[in-house]
């Protein structure tokens, strides 16, 4: 086995694919710097394998995988590759400088995929497995092979494919529920059957990779572990293709909380889970739903009088895990307009941020401006401020000023000043309401064809002076992006969110994708 082999039968490896499968979620594209920040977070919290991207997809993806491979201290860094020679060579080059690099190659195995996507016979696919796994093993010692659409593949043929992949040097075998079709009993039985029937199964670690189309991704992942898998592929916040992937935080906390019936451990520092969730939400501009398990805003909130009474008497009456175990701290009111740089830096470190000097200075200036406008500055305010600052560091369009005239009579009018690629411009626009006027002013300053698909507002903290956090989703052609903006003024937050979405569209305008998207 490779260096990532489990130290005991009970050890489960965590394979995070937020930067690859997670980023395939429509609108979730991350910048180069955001990918590096997420990878650093994953490495620091104890993720065993980071799937950093799909190197053949674009030069940007290759560069991100290569830089993550160079920087990562502990985690294995994997690059995805189709069962195509050029893909495998590109992935091998991308992870070449990693302390521990992995090539993850995949091919379809189900009858429906072979007939309609691959247009290959079973024997032809076996030959492809033989050649491509051998090529990958010549480049790296750590090779993962995946049977795409494994759960709709006849078990006899699946066993033949797995045996061939291991024979040619695969050290990890992934049997994904690609379309989220399996039930837990079926998934558990598949792993048990393959491991029992494949003669060389003991030479590889088996892996689960579950999609959430029927809401069964977590249940199936746990069932796969019970069936003998010792690696779980997952993403922060469960982002991913279609309905998403199994959420890392849910897998890890399920194993930790129910160790009485699931006697398996991971190497994850669970106290960093909330920080990772917020970082990914900020980078992808995908808000976490309020009732999301483990990391949702309401995950540890209790409104029912009966529940509150029980919590006051003993937290274990209605909490099966503590907020502190996943990094949720009690909100503190220690920051304000009189707080200096040292206190602010200490608070950032407490919240899990590590900023460069320039990033710190920008964040501190925004904090002081916020503190002048807001009586109490909560941890959540600081997190929203810093996350926005990191996400907009390389924007081509920046908001300089906004004035809105609104009321029951007369036109709703917005006057906006922007910095566009270093050039300042001002425009006025009317609208059917103040938000519409703001967005019309942006359109006048930055003409575009994008259509607004989502506009959502919620308060970051409590009180009438709470920061508003606005989410916006824009679609231009086949491309959809989501972005967020935060400010005590809802209209300013709206402008920031819309501009952040436009900046993401501009940043991704030249992004190239492989002819066939990896859809594990």
Curated annotation (Swiss-Prot):
Gene3D superfamilies, per database record: 1.10.238.260, 3.30.160.270, Aldolase class I
Location of the region described as Regulatory domain in the Swiss-Prot/TrEMBL record: 398-520
Ranges in coiled-coil conformation: none
GO cellular component, one term: cytosol
Domain Pyruvate carboxyltransferase: 12-274
Biological process terms in GO annotation: L-leucine biosynthetic process
Catalytic activity: 3-methyl-2-oxobutanoate + acetyl-CoA + H2O = (2S)-2-isopropylmalate + CoA + H(+)
Entry function: Catalyzes the condensation of the acetyl group of acetyl-CoA with 3-methyl-2-oxobutanoate (2-ketoisovalerate) to form 3-carboxy-3-hydroxy-4-methylpentanoate (2-isopropylmalate).
Stored HAMAP family: LeuA_type1
UniProt similarity note: Belongs to the alpha-IPM synthase/homocitrate synthase family. LeuA type 1 subfamily.
Protein name (record): 2-isopropylmalate synthase
Lineage of origin: Bacteria, Pseudomonadati, Pseudomonadota, Alphaproteobacteria, Hyphomicrobiales
Gene behind this protein: leuA
């Amino acid at each position: 086995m490779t260096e990532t082999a489990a130290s005991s039968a009970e050890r489960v490896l965590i394979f995070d694919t937020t930067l690859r499968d997670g980023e395939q979620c429509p609108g979730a594209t991350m910048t180069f710097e955001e990918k590096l920040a997420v990878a650093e977070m994953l490495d620091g919290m104890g993720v065993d394998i980071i799937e950093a991207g799909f190197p053949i997809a674009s030069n940007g993806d290759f560069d991100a995988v290569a830089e993550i491979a160079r920087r990562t201290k502990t985690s294995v860094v994997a690059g995805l590759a189709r069962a195509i020679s050029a893909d495998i060579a590109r992935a091998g080059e991308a992870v070449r400088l990693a302390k521990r690099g992995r090539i993850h190659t995949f091919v379809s195995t189900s009858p429906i995929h072979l007939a309609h996507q691959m247009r290959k016979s079973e024997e032809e696919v076996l030959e492809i497995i033989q050649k491509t796994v051998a090529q990958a093993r010549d480049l790296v010692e750590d090779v993962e092979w995946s049977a795409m659409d494994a759960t709709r593949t006849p078990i006899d043929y699946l066993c033949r494919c797995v045996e061939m992949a291991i024979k040619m040097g695969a050290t990890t075998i992934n049997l994904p529920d690609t379309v989220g079709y399996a039930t837990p009993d079926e998934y558990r039985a598949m792993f048990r059957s393959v491991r029992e029937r494949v003669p060389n199964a003991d030479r590889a670690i088996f892996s689960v990779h579950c999609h959430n189309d029927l809401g069964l991704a977590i249940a199936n992942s746990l069932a796969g572990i019970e069936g003998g898998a010792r690696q779980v592929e997952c993403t922060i916040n469960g982002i991913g293709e279609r309905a998403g992937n199994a959420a890392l935080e849910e897998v890890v906390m399920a194993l930790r909380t129910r160790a009485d019936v699931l006697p398996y451990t991971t190497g994850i520092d669970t106290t960093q889970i909330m920080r990772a969730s917020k970082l990914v939400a900020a980078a992808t501009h995908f808000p976490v739903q309020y009732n999301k398990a483990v990391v949702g805003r309401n995950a540890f909130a209790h409104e029912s009088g009966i529940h509150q009474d029980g919590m006051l008497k003993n937290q274990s009456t209605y909490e099966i895990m503590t907020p502190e175990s996943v990094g949720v701290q009690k909100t503190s009111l220690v920051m304000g307009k009189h707080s200096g740089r040292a206190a602010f830096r200490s608070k950032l470190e407490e919240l899990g941020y590590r900023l460069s000097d320039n990033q710190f200075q920008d964040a501190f200036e925004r904090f002081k401006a916020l503190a002048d406008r807001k009586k109490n500055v909560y941890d959540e305010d600081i997190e929203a401020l810093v996350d926005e600052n990191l996400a907009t560091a390389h924007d081509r369009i920046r908001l300089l000023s906004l004035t809105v005239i609104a009321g029951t009579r007369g036109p709703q009018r917005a006057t906006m000043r922007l910095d566009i690629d270093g050039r300042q411009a001002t425009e006025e626009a009317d609208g059917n309401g103040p938000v519409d006027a703001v967005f019309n002013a942006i359109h006048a300053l930055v003409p575009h064809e994008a259509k607004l698909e989502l506009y959502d507002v919620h308060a970051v903290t409590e009180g009438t002076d709470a920061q508003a956090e606005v989410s916006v989703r824009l679609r231009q052609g086949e491309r959809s992006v989501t972005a967020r903006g935060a400010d005590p003024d809802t209209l300013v937050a709206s402008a920031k969110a819309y501009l952040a979405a436009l900046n993401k569209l501009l940043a991704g305008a030249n992004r190239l994708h492989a002819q066939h998207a990896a859809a594990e």
